[in-house]
């Protein structure tokens, strides 16, 4: 791992409390999932000792995080905080960019808009944005659906990060080429057009506020990046762990969320709907067309799915 100047780690392990025979033939009940209140700062915790983890490994972990210029690091088990560490002046209230890990927020918001009947991800983007949102020939532009934007398979030129019609030229038919690119941002325009309101307003109402998150979108000329404190990132991680459900409300349709965290196309099996997937036979990375054999993170669980952004902004 590179010695990055900015590093935010959030780990939400996808495991439940272990069950063991207690000697009398009875198996302890599995621990329930915990959802922190959407207001205030209270949040249930668990101790390292209660989980039976190796407590002597904690200080070396903290030393490693400090060495790597980490800003914050959290471990949650079933929604409860096990570790919450801040470094280099960073605090629980410090706002920090998610970078591309925030793409998964766009995925969730798009899924909500679909479940409300406002859009269909298999419909041409041009249906919502009109003709000319790219410089591709009309028949090629019309091939691009929101699903292609979710899966990085638009076939549009990825050479320039600035998403303008002039830069969105035709390279390949939609669905035939995987390439990591900022064109996913057009999903925000699709949601805005379909809902009749600003994307951030729709996002705040349908997702952010329901989870008790803080934060805002910084819509720069090139990048559209979400900023929040680490606990807000953790809240979204809990939603992701529960396949789009928060307490009793299915905020994001479960079928859509399940699609999001499974292979979305055959070109890069390690990619879902803007989510990265472990345990696949091969993977591709941003910035190239090389196909690498093996799993994305060999020492991680094969069923892990992750929101991943530059400078190691992560939800695992």
Q: How would you describe each model-predicted region?
A:
Residues 2-10:
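Sec-dependent signal peptide recognition
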Residues 15-91, 96, 114-119, 151, ...:
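N-terminal leader/targeting segments and the immediately adjacent pre-domain N-terminus
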Residues 47-49, 92-97, 134-137, 171-177, ...:
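Second-shell loop/turn segments in exported
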Residues 62, 111, 126, 147-151, ...:
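Non-transmembrane alpha-helical segments in soluble domains
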Residues 72-76, 81-84, 99, 148-151, ...:
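Structural recognition of the beta-strand scaffold that forms the well-ordered cores
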Residues 79, 96-122, 149, 186-191, ...:
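Active-site SXXK
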Residues 116-154, 195-229:
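Active-site helix/loop module of the DD-peptidase/beta-lactamase fold
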Residues 212-314:
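Penicillin-binding protein/beta-lactamase superfamily catalytic region
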């Amino acid at each position: 791992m590179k010695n990055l100047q900015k590093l935010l780690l959030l780990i939400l392990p996808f495991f439940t409390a272990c069950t063991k025979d207690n000697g009398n033939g009875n198996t302890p009940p599995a621990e329930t999932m915990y959802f922190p209140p959407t207001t205030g700062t209270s949040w249930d915790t668990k101790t390292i000792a209660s989980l039976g983890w190796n407590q002597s490994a904690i200080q070396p972990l903290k030393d490693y995080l400090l060495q790597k210029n980490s800003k914050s690091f959290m471990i949650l088990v079933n929604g409860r905080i096990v570790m919450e560490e801040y470094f280099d002046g960073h605090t629980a209230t410090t706002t920090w960019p998610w970078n591309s890990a925030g793409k998964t927020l766009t995925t969730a918001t798009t899924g909500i808009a679909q479940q409300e009947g406002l859009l269909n991800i298999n419909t041409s983007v041009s249906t919502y944005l009109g003709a000319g949102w790219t410089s591709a020939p009309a028949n090629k532009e019309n091939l691009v659906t929101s699903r292609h934007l979710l899966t990085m398979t638009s076939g549009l030129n990825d050479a320039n990060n600035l998403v303008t019609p002039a830069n969105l030229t035709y390279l390949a038919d939609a669905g035939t080429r995987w390439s990591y690119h900022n064109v996913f941002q057009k999903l925000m325009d699709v949601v805005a057009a379909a809902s009749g309101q600003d994307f951030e307003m729709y996002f705040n109402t349908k997702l952010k506020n329901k989870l008790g998150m803080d934060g805002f979108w910084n819509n720069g000329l090139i990048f559209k990046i979400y900023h929040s404190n680490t606990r807000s990132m953790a809240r979204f991680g809990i939603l992701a762990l529960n396949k789009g459900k928060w307490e009793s409300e299915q905020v994001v349709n479960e079928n859509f969320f399940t699609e999001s965290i499974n292979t979305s196309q055959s070109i890069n099996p390690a990619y879902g709907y803007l989510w990265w997937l472990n345990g696949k036979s091969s993977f591709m990375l941003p910035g190239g067309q090389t196909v690498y054999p093996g799993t994305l993170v060999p020492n991680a669980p094969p069923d892990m799915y992750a929101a991943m952004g530059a400078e190691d902004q992560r939800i695992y």
